[in-house]
Amino acid sequence: MPLWVFFVLLTLTSGSHCSLPPSPPFRVRRHADAIFTSSYRRILGQLYARKLLHEIMNRQQGERNQEQRSRFNRHLDRVWAEDKQMALESILQGFPRMKLSAEA
């Protein structure tokens, strides 16, 4: 058997080594799938980064708000204590008058 016939037979029988390239519609579909997948992953990455950024900003804003709330609450407590003290003093100042008016 001539050598070239042997190579032709070997080429035709071995489908894995010398397979034909995929048909164009299959390649186009694979290419479109790859474009979609890479774009989808990029968008998911951007959404994840945006979510992390919002969480960090909300955490910082929450700490600021908590600090402002505690300052505001301390101020309210101080004002309430002062009002309570003034009301108590005015009541106590009224007692001697009440005693004097009750005795008279």
Curated annotation (Swiss-Prot):
A GO MF term: growth hormone-releasing hormone activity
Tell me which UniProt keywords the record has, alphabetically: Cleavage on pair of basic residues, Secreted, Signal
| Signal sequence bounds | 1-19
Q: Does the keyword Signal apply?
A: yes
| Domain of life where this protein originates | Eukaryota
Among the GO biological process terms of this entry, one is: adenohypophysis development
PROSITE patterns the UniProt entry points to = GLUCAGON
UniProt key word Transcription regulation: no
State the InterPro entries in the record: Glucagon_GIP_secretin_VIP (IPR000532), VIP/GHRH-like (IPR046963)
Compartments reported by the entry: Secreted
| One GO CC term, this protein | terminal bouton
Which residues lie in the propeptide? 20-30, 75-104
Q: Which family does it belong to?
A: Belongs to the glucagon family.
**Function field:** GRF is released by the hypothalamus and acts on the adenohypophyse to stimulate the secretion of growth hormone.
Q: What is this protein called?
A: Somatoliberin
Q: What species is this protein from?
A: Rattus norvegicus
